[in-house]
Amino acid sequence: MILDVIVEDKLKRLPEYKKRISEEEMTRLAIESHRVSHSFYDALAKDGLSIISEFKKASPSHGNMNNKITLEERIKQYGESADAISCLTEEDHFKGSTEYLKQIRQMTDLPIIRKDFIIDPYQVYEAKVIGADAVLLIAAILDDSRFKELYDLAYSLGLDVLCEVHNEEEMQRMLNLDVKIIGINNRNLKTFEVDLDTCLLYTSPSPRDG
């Protein structure tokens, strides 16, 4: 399955990241960071429709994206209507980079979410250091224990967390964990097929809505 391959590749890359900047150093940089985060949660919670514009170079399902305009031009366009920006940092399958997020941080005050396949605390610390205001955690690739560990770490660093689900079981897990922000992905990450009805199935009032 595609998701398994992506996670396997991420596991292979983690030692490379930690060799470049050690876990101890990345942790120190994140904890000592005095950067004030822009609230991703507030950007979504405001009245009316909220738009998250995404910077993505490629994807397994669509190949290379439209790269005819510069990053600066694209972020300028996003700033005209977006409430937040999503930046892909996964290298092998989406051609992302932490460098893109660093550059975007210099171009905008909009909240930025790091979109990646986060499986290790190192990646959360790194998100803080490179300028992200939030991180994506995908329920399908994390058990509850690791999910809670990464979730709590993110909030301790002043980062919001978008918790991604695709089915009823994942939705219930997130409700049980009492997470703050849940995003429903219409794309099945195991097959990469899209079903637009997915979000409709799981957007009825949740038990905690009364």
Language-model segments: residues:
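Conserved N-terminal beta1-alpha1 strand-loop-helix module at the mouth
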Residues: 1-101, 106-110, 119, 161-162, ...
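Surface-exposed amphipathic alpha-helices with a cationic face
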Residues: 45, 101-106, 128, 148-155, ...
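Hydrophobic residues within beta-strands of alpha/beta enzymes
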Residues: 85-86, 112, 135, 182
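Hydrophobic alpha-helical segments that mediate membrane insertion or helix-helix packing
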Residues: 104, 112, 127, 174, ...
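Short beta-strand elements of ligand-binding domains
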Residues: 114-116
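Conserved anion-binding
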Residues: 119-193
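Single conserved hydrophobic/aromatic residue that forms the stacking wall/gate
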Residues: 202-210
